Amino acid sequence: MSLLLFLLSFLLDGPQGQMESYFLQVQRIVKAQEGLCIFVPCSFSSPEGKWLNRSPLYGYWFKGIRKPSLSFPVATNNKDKVLEWEARGRFQLLGDISKKNCSLLIKDVQWGDSTNYFFRMERGFERFSFKEEFRLQVEALTQKPDIFIPEVLEPGEPVTVVCLFSWTFNQCPAPSFSWMGDAVSFQESRPHTSNYSVLSFIPGLQHHDTELTCQLDFSRMSTQRTVRLRVAYAPRSLAISIFHDNVSVPDLHENPSHLEVQQGQSLRLLCTADSQPPATLSWVLEDQVLSWSSPVGSRTLALELPWVKAGDSGHYTCQAENRLGSQQHTLDLSVLYPPQDLRVTVSQANRTVLEILRNAISLPVLEGQSLCLVCVTYSNPPANVSWAWVTQTLIPIQSSEPGVLELPLVQREHEGEFTCAAQNPLGAQRISLSLSVHYPPQMSSPSCSWEAKGLHCNCSSRAWPAPSLRWRLGEGLLEGNSSNASFTVTFSSLGPWVNSSLSLLQELGPSLWLSCESWNTHGAQTTSVLLLPDKDSATAFSKGAVLGFGITALLALCLIVVIVKTLQKKGTQEEPSRPKLSRGSTILDYINVVPKTRSLARNWKAEPDAPSRSSPLDTHFPKPKKKQKDPHFTYPGCPDPTSSSQVPVSENNPEELHYAALNFSRLRLQETQDPQDTYSDYTEVRVH
């Protein structure tokens, strides 16, 4: 019987031609993760109708060495066949062998399952082991479930989360699902045949940044996936970090409200905010937006100030905003720097005249005017501003406001260099100006004397700018250095002083008018000399003496009247002790040169003889230029125009004329001596 079976088996497994009719189609390499389920598709073909065999068809899967008689199959459709112990319950022949389907299902894959597997078919006396086989490669379990959840959860709004584990064959057993996390309060139960699990809950702000885990448990293994919940909320925890020269500033309170930085340093301000969804960050200086971030970008925004300057001071605000709200913080940046842009504003006679920006400026000021100097600088911390001057003959009035220097009444003693100094702990700056006091001509009383060659007169005047000086003889003008047969004029000047000497070589007629004129841009002054030569007739000594005493009394009376009127006018106009001259004003002083007799005269008659023409200043002096009117401007610290100490000048009387002229041409001397001695000596009588 055994021999018959062997022969039949040989015939069935015999020649090569018959073996080619058997073929198995299966994947050569099959990979599976430990603990999971794997399905291996398989089909085969075999010769048909060689023998009519009604025996059942069995299929077997073996692993390892091809010796079916020495091993147990791992899976078969023959219920009477004993299976390998480790494969029981895990390997399953799912294919319908009658339909030549040899598909294999492996559950709970283990590391020991890694080997080669071949298939064998049996039907009665027909038995054949296919040469085609597959190799199972077992790998570590890395497959995880997938969790489907909204990216951002709205607080107070219900949310549904799905955990899904996918595999390729429905016959694989479903794992057991479980949820873990702070948001888990209720779990929906699902049958084990389902490959997903659903979790519903209502998120709150307390759930933000917490973990939610979905875990799958198989028979011996488990796998899980964890997600972090992101619950939407308005910006919070906004913070500003400060870096000086790329170094973090230590010992600063969180979100400082004030920051001091020295000019020239580099500064980096870093703004951060916590929000969900990410907020849009922006830096704002006052009302100007300096920079902003993208909502999908970083949660930080840096503001770079590589070279801090004075103009960078201000209120810097970092603002974070999303659809749920906003938050902001303001930093007051104070840039420290030494005094700079030092300048002086000059106000003369209560009007702003100019602004001085550099050193060594000469400032002309009219004597008697008010002057206000305001020194201004930019610095932080505020600079200590002070004034200093070289000449201290008269101490100027220092205003209570720093940097303001007031001179209510400028005098010549104030001339000199004024220096404004501004200083703070970071540095100092100075600016100087030279004060030049201008004033109109002031003439000293001229002197005249008779010399051997004729009359010699000297005239001097002082003013700034230096005045011009000339003589007027009758209708003629004598100036500079000039001479001819009738006169010689010599001119000299030194600083504010000018001097002119006149020598008259011609015979002098009666009532000859001689004057000395001086002027500059601020005014003019004239001193007149009335020459009264006597006639050659002689008079009695006694009469001349009597008349001389009478004339002397009359002269004294005239002087008293003139002085009283002058004092009354000065009292009504409240003039200062020093004459205050306006542009274009003229003062005329008169001096009379009269004979001085050696003997008493007799039978004198006095008859006044006024000049036959008006003052030459009315027609021959250059008219002063009108000053252009400046707009009124009251600078802080300068005196108000109503408190001006400048002496007012009468517009109705631009010229003041004070003179007294006496004519002695008709007085005759007593013939007690030679008439030639009558003009030998002269004396000076000055009337101001």
Curated annotation (Swiss-Prot):
A motif (ITIM motif 2) lies at residues 657-662. It is found in: Cell membrane. This is Sialic acid-binding Ig-like lectin 10. It comes from Mus musculus (Mouse). Putative adhesion molecule that mediates sialic-acid dependent binding to cells. Preferentially binds to alpha-2,3- or alpha-2,6-linked sialic acid. The sialic acid recognition site may be masked by cis interactions with sialic acids on the same cell surface. In the immune response, seems to act as an inhibitory receptor upon ligand induced tyrosine phosphorylation by recruiting cytoplasmic phosphatase(s) via their SH2 domain(s) that block signal transduction through dephosphorylation of signaling molecules. (Microbial infection) During infection by RNA viruses inhibits RIG-I signaling in macrophages by promoting its CBL-dependent ubiquitination and degradation via PTPN11/SHP-2. InterPro entries: Ig-like_dom, Ig-like_dom_sf, Ig-like_fold, Ig_I-set, Ig_sub, Ig_sub2, Ig_V-set, SIGLEC. Residues 26-138 form the Ig-like V-type domain. Its main location: membrane. Residues 145-228, 250-334, 339-436 form the Ig-like C2-type domain. Keywords: Adaptive immunity, Cell adhesion, Cell membrane, Disulfide bond, Glycoprotein, Immunity, Immunoglobulin domain, Innate immunity, Lectin, Membrane, Phosphoprotein, Signal, Transmembrane, Transmembrane helix. The keyword Glycoprotein applies. Gene3D superfamilies: Immunoglobulins. N-acetylneuraminate binds at residue 120.
